[in-house]
């Protein structure tokens, strides 16, 4: 028995799908992966390096398609699980013949590229492509309510049906409420004053994550909250631009672009409020992590965020790109430590369905359904 996992980059597979690979490994499957270069995880028996390009319009994806089709033809997989937009398109195209011979193809949409508020032309194109490809998909998995509803709304037809799971899951043993002592220690280690009002948003510095909105919100709050501090762990192409914007807004001393961090579980202990300025998300795992530690949230009202944040209960949702609205809600939380605590406690409870063990249980049940389908197909030969 063989299973293939595909994604554009290795980091996606190693960051989110090791438990899924291990599920098959424990059941005697040979686990193969097809993605970009990187260190092969221990649970993978073979790694096929495929040069997927992030843009679907790059000619190099033709070579990626041919290489992937060859891998699928030669290995006769029982199950293929594809992730990330371009890799999932090419995988389903390359696996069409394999499906006729019994291969079960699973596709997880980590956020459709047609979404409420998307440019109309691009939404139409992506929706049309996804609808056509659904005919070449056995199981379609979504991670938020808007995407799940879109499947029936637009007439997608995956052979075995569609499912909604609570994302890839967050490790509750790692992300949990911290003691006051830990909070003090983390602040001291990171040079953060004890009385600072700390906001945090961990994300790549790019247009979609839209950290410029947060910088503008801080500029509106610096007089009302003179001890405000915005922590931005991450890296990306807009780092220099955001540094310039902070300087132009005269808020450099209130903002820290921290670079890539591997200690987010501890860094969250230093924060008072988790924020997100994203324009598009599949789910918003960074917010789940923050909520599990007991932080209230102020985030943009978009797909994914609306699944996680209960407006007025676990935090607040504001219109995308509306820095004044963001500032207003942050000021409200700043002025009421009691409200922050109350919302933070509710956030812990609201985030429980997104814990790793719960997300895995849902995904594993889908795998069992796929294995049953595989058995039935084999029996029908």
Regions found by a protein language model. Give the residues of each.
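Donor nucleotide-sugar binding/catalytic pocket of nucleotide-sugar-dependent glycosyltransferases
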Residues: 48-49, 131-181
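A short helix/loop element that forms part of the nucleotide-sugar donor recognition site in Leloir-type
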Residues: 67, 176-192, 339
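A short, well-ordered alpha-helix in the C-terminal region of glycosyltransferases
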Residues: 185-188, 325, 332, 339-353, ...
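Conserved donor-binding/catalytic core segment of Leloir-type glycosyltransferases
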Residues: 193-209, 215-218
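Nucleotide-activated donor-binding/catalytic signature segment of Leloir-type glycosyltransferases, i.e.
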Residues: 243-259
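Aromatic "clamp/platform" in nucleotide-sugar-dependent glycosyltransferases that forms part
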Residues: 260, 279
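Short hydrophobic beta-strand element within catalytic cores of glycosyltransferases
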Residues: 296-299, 309
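Conserved acidic donor-binding segment of nucleotide-sugar-dependent glycosyltransferases
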Residues: 311-312, 316-323, 332-337
């Amino acid at each position: 028995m063989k299973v293939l996992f595909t994604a554009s980059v290795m980091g996606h597979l190693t960051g989110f799908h090791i438990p899924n690979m291990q599920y098959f490994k424990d059941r005697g499957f040979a686990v193969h992966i097809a993605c970009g270069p990187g260190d092969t995880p221990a649970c993978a028996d073979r790694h096929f390096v495929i040069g997927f390009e992030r843009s679907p319009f790059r000619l190099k994806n033709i070579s990626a398609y041919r290489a992937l089709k060859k891998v699928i033809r030669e290995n006769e997989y029982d199950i293929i699980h594809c992730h990330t937009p371009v890799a999932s398109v090419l995988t389903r195209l390359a696996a069409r013949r394999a499906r006729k011979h019994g291969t079960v193809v699973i596709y997880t949409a980590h956020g459709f590229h047609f979404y409420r508020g998307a440019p109309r032309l691009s939404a139409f194109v992506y929706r049309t492509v996804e609808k056509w490809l659904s005919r070449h998909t056995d199981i379609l998995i979504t991670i938020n309510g808007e995407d799940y509803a879109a499947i029936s709304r637009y007439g997608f037809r995956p052979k075995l049906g569609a499912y909604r799971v609570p994302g890839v899951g967050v490790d509750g043993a790692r992300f949990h409420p911290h003691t006051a002592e830990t909070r003090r220690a983390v602040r001291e280690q990171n040079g953060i004053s004890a009385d600072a009002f700390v906001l945090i948003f961990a994300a790549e510095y790019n247009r979609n994550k839209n950290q410029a909105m947060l910088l503008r919100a801080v500029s509106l709050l610096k007089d009302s909250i003179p001890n405000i501090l915005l922590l931005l762990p991450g890296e990306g192409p807009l780092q220099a631009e955001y540094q310039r914007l902070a300087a132009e807004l005269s808020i450099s001393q209130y903002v820290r672009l921290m670079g890539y961090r591997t200690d987010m579980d501890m860094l969250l202990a230093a924060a008072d409020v988790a924020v997100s300025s994203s324009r598009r998300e599949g789910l918003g795992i960074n917010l789940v992590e923050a909520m599990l530690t007991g932080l209230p949230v102020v985030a943009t009202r978009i797909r994914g965020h609306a699944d996680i944040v209960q407006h007025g209960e676990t935090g607040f949702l504001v219109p995308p790109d509306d820095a004044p609205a963001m500032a207003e809600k942050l000021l409200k939380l700043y002025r009421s430590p009691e409200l922050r605590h109350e919302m933070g406690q509710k956030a812990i409870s609201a985030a429980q369905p997104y814990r790793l063990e719960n997300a895995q249980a849902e995904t594993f049940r889908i795998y069992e359904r796929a294995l049953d389908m595989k058995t039935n197909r084999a029996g029908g030969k």
